[in-house]
């Protein structure tokens, strides 16, 4: 399974920082890894687009089978817009819709990218200067994820 974006998963990196602040050890794993040198008690899975539902389902099944005792959390655009698709198939999954306010103002844990081949040479930061949007395009997900025109 390939993460379909050239950019790293910013939401997961912010959640990683949030978990580290609670004294939890955090690892970033890309795709379906068969050999992990740790046993997680929480697993976070994200999606960038709704059409990426299949890789999300594959990740849920794969990691739940490997770590049946771990809490599985799914967020991102797919989980926000279509939570019932996940909950109907995987009732054990905790769904998060929208932004995680506790993690919103944290700096992402970019240093975790060093262990992932695709991003090991990542030397950039991603900055959001506003949230929301003043436009009301019928196809756009931004108002559902980030709200209306607050700060835009």
Residue ranges of model-derived segments:
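A charged, well-structured terminal subsegment
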Residues: 97-119
């Amino acid at each position: 399974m390939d993460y379909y974006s050239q950019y790293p998963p910013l939401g997961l990196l912010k959640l990683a920082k949030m978990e580290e602040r609670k004294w939890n050890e955090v690892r970033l794993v890309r795709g379906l890894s068969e050999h992990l040198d740790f046993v997680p008690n929480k697993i976070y899975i994200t999606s960038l687009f709704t059409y990426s539902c299949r890789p999300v389902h594959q990740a849920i099944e794969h990691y739940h089978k490997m770590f049946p005792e771990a809490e599985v959390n799914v967020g991102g655009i797919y989980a926000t817009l279509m939570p019932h698709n996940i909950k109907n198939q995987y009732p054990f999954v905790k769904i998060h819709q929208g932004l995680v306010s506790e993690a919103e103002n944290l700096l992402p844990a970019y240093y975790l990218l060093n262990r992932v081949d695709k991003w090991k040479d990542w030397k950039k930061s991603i900055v959001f200067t506003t949230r929301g949007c003043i436009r009301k395009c019928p196809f756009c997900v931004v108002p559902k994820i980030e709200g209306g025109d607050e700060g835009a």
